[in-house]
């Protein structure tokens, strides 16, 4: 397959692209910084500096859209919220326009989203049919998905990746949590009762490959079948590192530090991968402690 990818130097892209190359696919990465992308991804990947030079995507078999400003790196000022939205919406709209301008469009657009689509639903078991709670993360993801779905046609199916917390050794949530936990300074956040829907990076990559190869469309919760509470996650991470994890971080401190974006760690979703499992996808990593032991070793 000839596959175009945005966000290729991000956490998921860095793990996905080597697998796609192993499988014999031809990969083109859309990037703002070709020099950086080349150093990260190597010489086997073709690079496009943006999409301005493209008038259509004829000859492209699939598009995987992973681009977007990291959501938890900065406080959510008005300006930062705008960056979070536009970094996702604009590139997605450009891809949709190119797909719709193609005589032979890609057969699939796999486009990013997040379990934040649902907002903070507390104890509710969240499948893809669950009505969302209307807050910023929902508004961001709902518009992102709505734009992507404009590419849907008889020739092009659209799959939406409602991604949970990705566990990987080289970034994501563990990139922030590992330093204090390695020092024995980790612990639950707030009450610790909030749910965390996690997925091992291997299952994330394999899930995308599954959607690439199977005639599926619509939203998919990209999460393990077994979400855990924050306090369970903290205990499991401490256990994987052979360190205590008992220093609870008060919710008040998190709110002072993060502002509105504190909802990302003080709230959560008890999300389940209902549609992936119904379609026959087999997860490799069910047990959180085993998954964490694998990524921190």
Swiss-Prot record:
InterPro entries per UniProt: DUF1731 (IPR013549), Epimerase_deHydtase (IPR001509), NAD(P)-bd_dom_sf (IPR036291), SDR39U1 (IPR010099)
Gene3D superfamilies named in the record: NAD(P)-binding Rossmann-like Domain
PANTHER family associated with the record: EPIMERASE FAMILY PROTEIN SDR39U1 (PTHR11092:SF0), SUGAR NUCLEOTIDE EPIMERASE RELATED (PTHR11092)
Protein family per UniProt: Belongs to the NAD(P)-dependent epimerase/dehydratase family. SDR39U1 subfamily.
Protein name: Epimerase family protein YfcH
Organism: Escherichia coli (strain K12)
């Amino acid at each position: 397959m000839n596959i175009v990818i945005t966000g290729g130097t991000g956490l998921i892209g860095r793990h996905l692209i080597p697998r796609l190359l192993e499988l014999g696919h031809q990969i083109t990465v859309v990037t703002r910084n070709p020099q950086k992308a080349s150093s990260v991804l190597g010489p086997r990947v073709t690079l496009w500096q943006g999409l301005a030079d493209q008038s259509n995507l004829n000859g492209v078999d699939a598009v995987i859209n992973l681009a977007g400003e990291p959501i938890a790196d900065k406080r959510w000022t008005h300006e930062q919220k705008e960056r979070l939205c536009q970094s996702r919406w604009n590139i997605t709209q450009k891809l949709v326009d190119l797909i719709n301008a193609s005589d032979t469009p890609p057969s699939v657009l796999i486009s990013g989203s997040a379990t934040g689509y649902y907002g903070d639903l507390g104890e509710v078991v969240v499948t893809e049919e669950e009505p969302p709670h209307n807050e910023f993360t929902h508004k961001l993801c709902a518009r992102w998905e709505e734009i992507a779905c404009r590419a849907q046609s008889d020739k092009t199916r659209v799959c939406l990746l409602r991604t949970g917390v990705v566990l990987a050794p080289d970034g994501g949530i563990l990139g922030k949590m590992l330093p204090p936990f390695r020092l024995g300074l980790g612990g639950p956040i707030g009450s610790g009762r909030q749910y965390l829907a996690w997925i091992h990076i291997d299952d994330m990559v394999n899930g995308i490959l599954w959607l690439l190869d199977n005639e599926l469309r619509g939203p998919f919760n990209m999460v393990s079948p077994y979400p855990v509470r924050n306090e369970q996650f903290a205990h499991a991470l401490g256990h994987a590192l052979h360190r205590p994890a008992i220093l609870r971080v008060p919710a008040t401190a998190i709110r002072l530090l993060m502002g509105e974006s504190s909802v990302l760690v003080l709230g959560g979703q008890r999300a389940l991968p209902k549609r992936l499992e119904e379609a026959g996808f087999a997860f490799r990593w069910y047990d959180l402690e085993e998954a964490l032991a694998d990524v921190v070793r």
